[in-house]
Each structure stands twice: as structure tokens, then as C-alpha cells.
Amino acid sequence: MRNLFRRTSNPDWGSLSSAVATGAAVGGLCASTLGLASGLFDLVASGADAWSLLSGSVVTGLASAWLFRRVRSPRRHETADILTGVTVAFLGMVLLGTLLYLLTGTLTDPRDALFESAAGFSTTALTSLDVDALGRGMLLFRAGSQWVGGLTALLLGVAILPALSVDRELADRHTGTGRRPLAPSGGRAAGNVLRLYAGFTLLLGIGYLVAGAGPLGSVLLAASTASTGGFVGPGQPLADPAVQWVAILGMFVAGASMVILWRIVTLQWQGIRRSAEFRTYLLLLSAGTLLLGWWSEAGGPDEWRETLFTLLSAVTTTGFPMEAVGPWATAAPVLLLLAAAVGPMTGSTGGGFQLFRMLGLVKLARRELMRQLHPSLIARIRIGGVVLSEASVGRIVLQQFLFVAIVVGTTGVVGILGLDLATALAAGVHAAATAGPVRALDGTLLEAASWSRPVRLALVPAMLIGRLALYPALVAIGTAATGIQNRLRLKWRWNALAKERDR
């Protein structure tokens, strides 16, 4: 056994192969650890899925550990290869989650299992499961997959991308007199993010427990709120007003940037006051709640509470379900769809295009209009004291194009597969923004389980790319396409040389 996991003595691997293998191993270890914890929980609760979860998790965990020990890292990894490795790790978690759904018999069709696993790890509030029929172990696995997916998004946005000189302006890295940055280095950033995320989840669990959600319900709701995943367990716990208030506070915090939360914890109030993105976040929530209440004819305190809950669920892309308050005007679901598309603050667990990038686009449009009047104008784009480099501005424009392209492409595919235009557009936006739930024009909640399997399967790529913040996923796709193209070109040249020799 010792020799099995001993480091190989082979020469160092290439940058891409090392990153891909490490990513696959890390993804497998994360998913198998979650499955093992869920299996042990189900075993204690005398559930029927315990041994399937435990056996599948142990086998995949050992295989992942063996692969991790066999990898020999090169002296330097290329940035594109690291992003490819991150994408492979995420895909590995999704695929192993699919396997566990099938092994436990929770889902028998691989397409359903892939959709459910992708929705969980991408924190998309869509599900085809009957939660009342799930055992405790699988309930914990489904909610836990969201929590892991939310942590992946935070580590990617706050620790990994800034360390690779991508979106460095979005990270709190600079030290100074009296300043304690969130991310002075990649390792410190990961540790700070993990502590904040885990502590926030723990506080949410205590809050839900005090509000009366019950032990299991509190764990499920805490994981879903912190990760903005929107999965709700059996028994309709969100029908309780006290539980709703905890969810409202939790969604508000989950939609805020980790930098803001760090500054609150470390009592750095000046940085919070200077944050233009945080002010925009507060303005969006306030104006959106008033508009939604007006368009849904909200009356008493209960209806306004439910209106605020619904608006927060959309803006933060959490996707907790709430029935429409009163008769909805046609503009109400459009408002929620736009709110989900824009999303919360950058550096949060929420999805969507996100507010910092939206502010960057607005500032860019203003600058280009001013240049039409003053062609020699030299102006930098500044957001709340942060000066964006031209590379970051170009990346924001690229991400806007990619987001719109994914929404349009997904809408077209699911429309061809049978959804009407309004539902197809809503499904495309929510998949790309990792949000939910999808609503009809009258505000009625639509169940993903009622859609055909091809429709649900068509949403999976948008969910995965959306959770990976577009850029890393597209870099990975480009790297894979380049590798395939190079191999085909090499094979073509080899065949041409072989034909020359035969002559």
C-alpha cells in the first residue's frame, strides 16, 4: 500500500498534463470526501443509501489519491494550463457526483444524474428531484455539493485568478498603514476565504435552528444560502416568516463581496464607505424591492417581506422559491430576470454578470461617448477608487459578449427542443447566471422536472460555464481545442511523410 501511493520517480510532467491530472485528482478527492461524509451521516441515521455512498466514495477517493501522488509537477505552470486544471477539477466533481446519484439509485437515468449533479455543484436553483423521497444522506450530498461549488467560485475569484494576474483589481491585495488585506497572497487568500465562508455558514445554521427550521433543515438551508444554491429540503421550511427573515439576511450577506465581509470583520469601515459596487448593490435592492412591490400590488408587512425575499432571491441568484405576491404586472418577471442576469457583487458566491463588471461597462460607454466629443481625451476607468487597466476593461467586454452568447445559444437550443420563447429565454438566463427558479410571465413557478431530458441536458454547459465565471471555462475549451488541432496536424504530417517514404 505504501508503494501504491509513493511519488513516481519519472521525470516532471508537462505543464498541461500535470495541471489536468492534478485537477482531476483534486476534483475526485473533493467529491469523494463529500460523498463519504454524506454516507456516514446516512449510516448514523440508518438510511438506505449509506453503503452505496460509502463504497463509491472510498473507491473514487483512493483512485484520486493515487493519481494525485503520481503527478510530477513541472517547475512552472502556464496560466492557461492552470485554468484548464481548475476546470477539469470542477468537471471531475460533477462527474463523480453523477456516479453517486446512479450508485444510490436516487436517479436511474444518467442524463438526469448529470443534470442534478451539475445543478448542485454549479449552485443553480434547478432540480428534478423529489425531495420528500430522498434519504438524509442524499439530502446532505445535494446541499453539500452546492456548498463546495460556492467555495470553488470564491477561491477561483479571490485567490486563483488574481494570483495569475487575472482581475487583480478585484482582489484586496495591497498592504498599507492600518490595512489588513483579504488576499495578500494566494495561500493567505484561500485561508481567509475558507474561514469567512465556513463561519458564515455556521452562523446561518444557528440562525435557522433558532428560527425553528429543525436540525437537518437548518443544515440544508445554511448550505444553500451561503452558496446561493437555493436547494430546499422537505417540509416547506421557508413558509415560516421567522425562517424567511433569516434567509433574507443570509442572502443579503451572501450577495456581498468577500472583500466587504472581510472589512466588516476586521473593522475597516473606510473601505466599505468607498465601495461604489456596494452602494450600487444597496441601490439595486432598494429600487428593485419598491418596483416589484408596486408591480405585484403588495399591501401589508407580510407581502412586503415576501417581496423583499423574492427580489433578494433573484439578485443574489440564490433562487429560493416564493409564490407570486398578488397579481403580477408583466414587468415584474422581466425585472426579476434582469436582476438575475446582472447578479450580485463580484467576489461573492452569486452568479450572473455581476455588478463590478456592469459598472465597468457603464463607465466604458461613458468614456467612449466623451471621446466622440473630445478625440484627444485620455481617461482611465475608475470604480470606487480602483483604476482598471485596459486589459481588465477588454476582459470585461469579452465576458459581456460571452455571457450574452451563452444565453442566446442556450435559449435557441432549448427553444428548438420544445420550450416556448419566454420560458426558453428565462431558462437560458438562469442557467448562465446559475440562478433560479424559472417563472412564467404571470409569476408562476415552473418545475425543471416537467421539462424533457434533452432540455435539461442542454442547460448543463451554460450552468458549468456560468459557475466558472466564463473566462476559465472558455480558456480550458480553447486549450483543449488547440491541443486537438495540434495533434490532428501532427498526425496529418506524419501520414504525409509516410506516403512520401512509400513512394
Task: Specify the residue positions occupied by each region the protein language model found.
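Membrane-proximal intracellular helices of multi-pass ion channels
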Residues: M1-R503
